[in-house]
């Protein structure tokens, strides 16, 4: 053996692996397709991150709106329940804690408030462009109750609906038949005295 053959044996053995060392390779794919695949994966990841951030922001915004609505109604124990009529989608019902029940009838353009003891019912006509909030409605009913207690004016029962002529504050709505109130308001108020505010 001569010296030249020793040098050949000292070299590292040939590499028979499918992929080159230190590189990720996809067999039988050209380089430009590999780059395109990497770009597509990066774009999909960016879109997923953006959509996730938007959904998280929407969730936070919804929670904030619900919290503000609950705080505007009153105390934390105030519960609000919205029930939409399945047929006409014109009635909204709100339960204000244990203090009373409010029905917004958008078809008849009326709001009815019945306090918890259920001794009377307050009805208010609304304009479609200016629907009062629950807080404004309860304030108006409270002010009306204060005026009535100062005047000691008796309630006008539903049997006297036909006798009431005007729609002054404290009078019952005109019309002999309480059917003009609509089914939701008539169901809420029943046979208790009605006050038009």
From Swiss-Prot:
PROSITE patterns listed in its UniProt record: BRICHOS, SURFACT_PALMITOYL
Residue ranges occupied by any BRICHOS domain in the UniProt entry: 94-197
GO molecular function terms listed in the Swiss-Prot or TrEMBL record: identical protein binding
Record keyword Methyltransferase present: no
Lipid moiety-binding residues (S-palmitoyl cysteine): 28-29
Location in or out of the cell: Secreted, Extracellular space, Surface film
Gene3D superfamilies assigned: 3.30.390.150
GO CC terms: alveolar lamellar body; clathrin-coated endocytic vesicle; endoplasmic reticulum membrane; extracellular region; extracellular space; lamellar body; multivesicular body lumen
Broad class of where this protein is predominantly found: secreted
Listed Pfam families: BRICHOS (PF04089), SP_C-Propep (PF08999)
Disulfide bond residue pairs: 120-148, 121-189
Biological process annotations from GO: respiratory gaseous exchange by respiratory system
Prodomain positions: 1-23, 59-197
InterPro entries xref list: BRICHOS_dom, SP-C, SP-C_palmitoylation_site, Surfactant_protein_propep
Entry keywords, A to Z: Disease variant, Disulfide bond, Gaseous exchange, Lipoprotein, Palmitate, Secreted, Surface film
Role description: Pulmonary surfactant associated proteins promote alveolar stability by lowering the surface tension at the air-liquid interface in the peripheral air spaces.
Disorder this protein is connected to according to its UniProt record: Pulmonary surfactant metabolism dysfunction 2: A rare disease associated with progressive respiratory insufficiency and lung disease with a variable clinical course, due to impaired surfactant homeostasis. It is characterized by alveolar filling with floccular material that stains positive using the periodic acid-Schiff method and is derived from surfactant phospholipids and protein components. Excessive lipoproteins accumulation in the alveoli results in severe respiratory distress.
Note: Pulmonary surfactant consists of 90% lipid and 10% protein. There are 4 surfactant-associated proteins: 2 collagenous, carbohydrate-binding glycoproteins (SP-A and SP-D) and 2 small hydrophobic proteins (SP-B and SP-C).
Protein name: Surfactant protein C
Gene: SFTPC
């Amino acid at each position: 053996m001569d010296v030249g053959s020793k040098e050949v044996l000292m070299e590292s053995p040939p590499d028979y692996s499918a992929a080159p060392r230190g590189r990720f390779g996809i067999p039988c794919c050209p380089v430009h397709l590999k780059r395109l695949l990497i770009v597509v994966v990066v774009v999909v990841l960016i879109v997923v991150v953006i959509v996730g951030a938007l959904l998280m922001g929407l969730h936070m915004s919804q929670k904030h709106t619900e919290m503000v609505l609950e705080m505007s109604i009153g105390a934390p124990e105030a519960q609000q329940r919205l029930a939409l009529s399945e047929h006409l989608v014109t009635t909204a019902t709100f339960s204000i804690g244990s203090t009373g029940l409010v029905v917004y009838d958008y078809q008849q353009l009326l709001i009815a408030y019945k306090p918890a003891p259920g001794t009377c019912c307050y009805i208010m006509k609304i304009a479609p462009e200016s629907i009062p909030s629950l807080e404004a409605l309860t304030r108006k009913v409270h002010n009306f109750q204060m005026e009535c207690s100062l005047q000691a004016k008796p309630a006008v029962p539903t049997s006297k609906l036909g006798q009431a002529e005007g729609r002054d504050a404290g009078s019952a709505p005109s019309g002999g038949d309480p059917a003009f109130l609509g089914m939701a308001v008539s169901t809420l108020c029943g046979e208790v005295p009605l006050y038009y505010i």
